[in-house]
Every structure is written in structure tokens, then in C-alpha cells.
């Protein structure tokens, strides 16, 4: 898979794309109670944070997760408005290279 450093999503675009995918698929992958909780609390405590892919993704995918091209977006709720997300609803792995649409999601169980 050949990728171009000059053809990547920005960090903001990556966050936005991951959140859009999350919203589109949440109803099929989360319990109804979790969806209600997320929707009620997101305005005050919700967020999406961008990270380099965690090492445990290697258990789920069989390709190199070069952080120049792959990002992990954690979507969930924090205890406080500016706190770290500690109630995780989904972890989204995205390829940031625009010509390689690739996404994997680990949903809350």
C-alpha cells in the first residue's frame, strides 16, 4: 500500500470523519441505553480525542500501523468538561491517507 504524506487528512478532518462514522454506526453496535446516555451527556462531557494507534490494534489488523498514516480516535465521555475521556464508547482506527479509505472500530461491550 503506497501512501503519500502530502495527501493526508488533517487532525481535525480525522476527528470529524471518525465522529461521523461513529454516529452512523452507533445504533447498530451500542446498547440503546448507552446511546441514550451518550446523547444526553455528550454536550457537557463528551469528546473525541486523537492518538497514535495503540499497540493492541495489532491483535485486530494485519498491517503496519505507521502513525504517519494511521490514527486512533477515542470517542466517549469524561468525568468533567475538560477531563480525559474515561468512559469509552468506541475506539476508531482510521487511515489518514485520503486515497486509502480504511476504518476499524472497537465498540464498547
UniProtKB/Swiss-Prot annotation:
Please state the span of the N-terminal signal peptide per the UniProt entry: none
Q: Name one Pfam family in it.
A: DUF440
- Name the InterPro entries for this protein: dsDNA_mimic_put, Put_dsDNA_mimic_sf
User: HAMAP family from the entry?
Assistant: Put_dsDNA_mimic
General function of this protein: May act as a double-stranded DNA (dsDNA) mimic. Probably regulates the activity of a dsDNA-binding protein.
Identify the NCBIfam families for this entry. PRK05094.1
* The family this protein is said to belong to: Belongs to the putative dsDNA mimic protein family.
Q: What's the protein here called?
A: Putative double-stranded DNA mimic protein YciU
Source organism of the structure: Salmonella paratyphi A (strain AKU_12601)
Q: Gene name on record? A: yciU
